Amino acid sequence: RFKKIRRLGALPGLTSKRPRSGSDLKNQLRSGKRSQYRIRLEEKQKLRFHYGLTERQLLKYVHIAGKAKGSTGQILLQLLEMRLDNILFRLGMASTIPGARQLVNHRHILVNGRIVDIPSYRCKPRDIITTNNKQRSKALIQNFIASSPRQEELPNHLTIDPFQYKGLVNQIIDSKWIGLKIN
């Protein structure tokens, strides 16, 4: 993980740690001129590592975004941001996206009252995301919410009730609230 964030810059979904400022300067001195190919490759790798996708998954999302009307890049980011694991991360119910994936895989999360164990589940507006009624599930989410003070404000497409451990997807994400800076 640290090699990835040193090479690509801060990836908030992958880890909460930040690259040291000195290592960034060394990389820039060593690299020389950046070709268009290298820039596109780095941006693609940022997307992959931030959202925890394989190459094949990312290509499927690009294909879906290409078929839809509108800007392919914006639609791609909207598709990735509306994944269940990413929404749990944005709500503060998990410290990282891999942590959110684990919560979903271990069946701690309900969407509209049903257990969902697929991290790539595409959330829709008016979806209600809650924890399982088991004591262990509530304790896990409570620890995440208590231990992670919200550095950034909650995006306007999400609302959370931290006392009931419930989140709500209000609408599809707006482009200004996307957490990753992509060229």
Curated annotation (Swiss-Prot):
SMART domains hit by this protein: Ribosomal_S4, S4
Highest rank taxon of the organism: Eukaryota
Chief location bin: plastid
Keywords for this protein: Chloroplast, Plastid, Ribonucleoprotein, Ribosomal protein, RNA-binding, rRNA-binding
One record GO biological process: ribosomal small subunit biogenesis
Xref: InterPro entries: Ribosomal_uS4, Ribosomal_uS4_bac-type, Ribosomal_uS4_CS, Ribosomal_uS4_N, S4_RNA-bd, S4_RNA-bd_sf
One GO cellular component, as annotated: small ribosomal subunit
Subcellular location: Plastid, Chloroplast
Regions crossing the membrane: none
GO molecular function: rRNA binding; structural constituent of ribosome
CDD domains from the UniProt entry: S4
Entry annotated with the keyword tRNA processing: no
Keyword Chloroplast assigned: yes
Domain S4 RNA-binding: start-end pairs: 82-143
NCBIfam families hit by this protein: PRK05327.1, rpsD_bact
Family of the protein in this entry: Belongs to the universal ribosomal protein uS4 family.
Biological function: One of the primary rRNA binding proteins, it binds directly to 16S rRNA where it nucleates assembly of the body of the 30S subunit. With S5 and S12 plays an important role in translational accuracy.
The protein's assembly and partners: Part of the 30S ribosomal subunit. Contacts protein S5. The interaction surface between S4 and S5 is involved in control of translational fidelity.
The protein's name in its UniProt record: Small ribosomal subunit protein uS4c
Species assigned in the record: Freesia sp. (strain Lejeune 1997)
